[in-house]
Each structure stands twice: as C-alpha cells, then as structure tokens.
From Swiss-Prot:
3'-to-5' exoribonuclease specific for small oligoribonucleotides. The gene is orn. Residues 8-171 form the Exonuclease domain. One of its GO terms (cellular component) is cytoplasm. This is Oligoribonuclease. It is found in: Cytoplasm.
Length: 181
C-alpha cells in the first residue's frame, strides 16, 4: 500500500493530566490504516521527556496509571522533547497520508487535539479539520443499543499504541455490530 488521501491517521497521547494549560504530553503514538481499517503501519511510539517538577503535578490517577505502566520511568529517561516527537511523527505520516487529508482519528480525540494545538501545532495542522471520534459511536451505542457493548472487550492499558489498536478494533466492532455495514 502507498500514500493515499483515503488513509486514516490514528493518534493517541498520554498526558500528565487533562488541562493543556498546565499539563503536558508524555507519550505519543500513531497508526495509519486504510479506509477499511486495515492497519498499514505503526508510527514511532515516543516517550516525551518532562521535568520532575512537571511530573510532580500529576494527580493520583495519573501517577498510579503512568507509574504502573512504566511510562513515568520512560519519560524521565527520554531525551526527546515535544518538537522532536512532533517532527518524528510528521516524518512517519508523510509516507502514508498527504497533509490535510485525514481527519484526526481515535477515542476522545478532541482532548488530544487540544494538547497538539498547544504543544505540537505543526502536527495538529497536519490533520483535516474533521474528527473521526470512536467515542461518539460508543455514546450512541450506550443509548441506542447497549446490549452490543458487552461484546466489546478492551484492556485500557493507557499506553498510547495499545489504546490506538483498541480504537481501531472498536470502530471495526461498531461497524459490524452497530452500524452494520
């Protein structure tokens, strides 16, 4: 498969919290799929260095989750800053999708986009202005066909690459069991 405007860019960020004015990106990963959700390639998974002072601002949930996954140690050991992570991610995406072609894809991606806008604006601008947010279908299924949610199993590791793989699989599940295409 080659570069195509029909390919989709999936992204997930792990952050120190939910407020882009205070919190920071600590991990970024991307996956490119074709329009039928077949994974074409996985981009770099990058732990983004943040200071001990920044990490100390995390709440209990983030400390527990990101320490338990090993991400905090990876962030402390990383030499890669926001700009370097942004550049490496764009270099990967340029091989698969023209700039401005793909919506930003994933779960609750408006939150990711807020952080990209603040800390990785060139990457944020690489996406089309539209969103393909799997959490929209999750909310609709919860209200209109809740019985299908029992068949959806997620690990919720809160590791960026795992989360993206689960988002792609979740959309494929909804396509088959909810949208029924």
């Amino acid at each position: 498969m080659s570069k195509s405007e029909h390919n989709l860019i999936w992204i997930d960020l792990e952050m120190t919290g939910l407020d882009p004015e205070r919190d920071r990106i600590i991990e970024i990963a991307t996956i490119v799929t074709d329009a039928n959700l077949n994974i074409l390639d996985e981009g770099p998974v990058i732990a983004v260095h943040q200071s001990d002072e920044q990490l100390a601002l995390m709440d209990k949930w983030n400390v527990r989750t990101h320490t338990g996954s090993g991400l905090v140690e990876r962030v402390k050991a990383s030499k890669i800053d926001d700009r370097e992570a942004e550049k490496a991610t764009i270099e990967f995406l340029e091989k698969w999708v023209p700039a401005g072609a793909s919506p930003i894809c994933g779960n609750s991606v408006s939150q990711d986009r807020r952080f990209l806008f603040r800390y990785m604006p060139e990457l944020e601008a690489y996406f089309h202005y539209r969103y393909l947010d799997v959490s929209t279908l999750k909310e609709l299924a919860r209200r209109w066909k809740p019985e299908i949610l029992a068949g959806l199993k997620k690990q919720n590791t809160h590791q960026a690459l795992d989360d993206i793989r689960e988002s792609v699989a979740e959309l494929a599940y909804y396509r088959e069991h909810f949208i029924q295409l």
